[in-house]
Design a protein with these regions (language model features):
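Short beta-strand/loop segment at the start of cytosolic alpha/beta domains
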Residues: 1-11
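A short acidic, often aromatic-flanked loop/helix-cap motif at beta-alpha or helix-coil junctions
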Residues: 10-12, 78, 96-97
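Amphipathic alpha-helical interaction surfaces in cytosolic regulatory modules
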Residues: 16-90
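Short acidic-hydrophobic, aromatic-tinged amphipathic segments that line or gate anion-handling sites
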Residues: 89-97
Length: 97
């Protein structure tokens, strides 16, 4: 997994699957939340997301008041987030390329 940030916009390439992926995502977003209350994340092609990442994103929205927008490129990940009733909480949109 690769992660990059420009301003309040984060791009994630590859599958989100390991503890190291979670740590990279958390570190990147922790730094951004010091300066921004709105963050957009493009998840280009991951087919899933670990529970630790989902829990962390939920904390950002529900506890820290971050306005999160999650743009997802893979239909399976959208279905997972829908099954977990997270589409509206994370403002999930289908990523158009």
């Amino acid at each position: 997994m690769e992660i990059s940030a420009r301003g309040n916009h984060v791009t994630i390439k590859g599958n989100i699957k390991s503890l190291q992926d979670y740590q990279k995502i958390k570190e990147t977003l922790d730094n951004l939340t010091k300066s921004y209350k709105q963050i957009t994340i493009d998840v280009l092609d991951s087919i899933s997301m670990t529970s630790s990442v989902i829990g962390y994103l939920n904390k950002l929205v529900m506890k820290d008041g971050i306005d999160l927008k999650l743009n997802v490129g893979n239909e399976k990940l959208i279905e997972l987030l829908e099954d977990l009733n997270l589409l509206s909480i994370f403002n999930v949109k289908r990523l158009v390329r």
